[in-house]
Amino acid sequence: MKNYFVSIIIPCYNQAQYLVEVVDSVLGQTYANWECIIVNDGSPDHTAEVANELLKKDDRIRYVEKENGGLSSARNFGIQQATGQYILPLDADDKIAPDYVSGCIDAFKDDAGLTVVYCEAEFFGEMTGKWSLPAYTLQALLLDNMIFCTAMFKKSDWEEAGGYDEHMKNGMEDWEFWISLLKEKGRKVLKLPMVGFYYRIRGKSMVENIDPSKKMKNYEYVCKKHIDFVMEQTGNPILNYIELNLYKERLDKIKNNSLFVFCKKIKRIFDLNSTQDNRRR
């Protein structure tokens, strides 16, 4: 392996329309010691055609294909092909700032004991602005994820953690991976004070559309998988906390439902009419 060589992994499923933009953000990096692996996860669209055109732009770009297996499977497949010591996952509809890779590598050079390096982030697309995430602590990570997927880590640590869990096909696979990666004592995380990552907001972004029932199943699955660690960190109260949060989330979703709002208005009308009738009597 080349020294401080970075493998940028771009899984792609039916996102051909975004590939040029995301790869251009990789080509614009100030750090030159990288390879970019586009993983076609069985896309029925024209991902292959776009990717093959991108190969002509730079010989550091690679393209591989596989049968559809989901995001975790595609990331794992790409990382298996990677020759870099350092891995940076990057979803096909997102992009990175020109100095992001160099910032991560400088951090690893300064502190070889780091496990994960990430940065500040912003939204783009259908919504813009800063992506405000809570500060990382291991205990806070057990309650919710605050590290987006495009964070840099060592391939050797990915291997030790067992990769991304391919059973998690309904989102939140990043969260489970960070728990697997960081739960061992002594793991260090650094957040760079720079905007290096841009997360696209679109109508069907997975993060924005996880059904509460599927989210609950994800929580249950992760808690069971890492139960010893969960109990060691927080004990039983965390499970009650998770269930309470999901209950509130479901309740908010019901309250904001247009049918629920309509029924409330109808009820108010009936209540008003009933009050007026009582007064007439």
Question: Which residue stretches match the model-derived regions?
Answer:
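N-proximal low-complexity "stem/linker" segments adjacent to membrane-targeting elements
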Residues: M1-L27
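Cell-envelope/extracellular polymer assembly enzymes that use nucleotide-activated donors
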Residues: Y4-S7, E35, E176
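A conserved acidic beta->alpha catalytic loop
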Residues: N40-E49, G69, D91
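Glycine-rich, basic loop-to-helix element that forms the pyrophosphate-binding segment
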Residues: K66-A82
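Short aromatic/hydrophobic "clamp" motif used to bind/position activated sugar donors
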Residues: I87
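Conserved donor NDP-sugar-binding/catalytic core segment of glycosyltransferases
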Residues: D99-K130
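Conserved nucleotide-sugar donor-binding catalytic segment
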Residues: Y136-Y221
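Boundary detector for helix-to-coil junctions that initiate low-complexity/charged tails
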Residues: E220, K224-R281
